[in-house]
A protein has these predicted regions:
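Non-heme di-metal
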Residues: 1-184
Length: 184
């Protein structure tokens, strides 16, 4: 039996949403602690432990998001999200490169700037990887005649009629409201 959406519309929905967000933040916190432990104090084993805790927290957050039906379970919507995510990842490369330039101007050391530039390359890789998944597994669809909307915050691309989505629709990538999208 699927856990997807079991708490959506129930008295637990708000609590589960808070747990999902808290676990996601907790995952990022443990990853940051791992970097600090390794880079500042040379504690490689402590860093490994924190990375494992971060992985667990991230997994917990995903579970709670599933309980609330946060991401699409319909196959068409699933692949639409993957396509939009892929395009956002490609756009992320340029955005993160620009961030690296600004950080360099602010005086971030070369090692830090290089790390951010590596993140930009990883964003590009994420775009390439999701594109390869789409090409290999997704049903073929013609999107040429469908309207496209792009989230102004994260670059997620929605294909189809956004007006058909409920008023409380949120970007599946950054959780911004429907009003954050611009028609292309």
């Amino acid at each position: 039996m699927s856990i997807f959406g079991k708490t959506k519309g129930t008295e637990l929905e708000k609590t589960i949403a808070q747990l999902a967000q808290g676990e996601a933040i907790g995952g990022a916190m443990y990853y940051a602690l791992a970097k600090i432990a390794k880079e500042k104090f040379g504690l490689d084993e402590v860093a490994k432990e924190f990375i494992e805790l971060g992985n667990q927290e991230t997994n917990h957050g995903a579970f709670y998001a599933m309980l609330n039906g946060r991401y699409p379970s319909d196959e068409k919507e699933f692949w639409q999200m993957v396509r939009g995510l892929s395009k956002a990842e490609y756009k992320g490369e340029n955005n993160v490169e620009q961030l690296a330039d600004k950080l360099a101007q602010l005086g971030l050391d070369e090692k830090g700037v290089a790390q951010v530039r590596e993140f930009a390359l990883q964003e590009k890789h994420h775009g390439e990887a999701t594109k390869a998944i789409i090409e290999k597994y997704a049903p073929k669809e013609d999107f040429d005649d469908k309207p496209r909307y792009v989230c102004k915050v994260c670059g997620f691309e929605y294909t189809g009629n956004l007006e058909n989505e409920p008023a409380d629709y949120k970007c599946p990538l950054c959780a911004m409201p429907k009003t954050a999208f611009e028609k292309q």
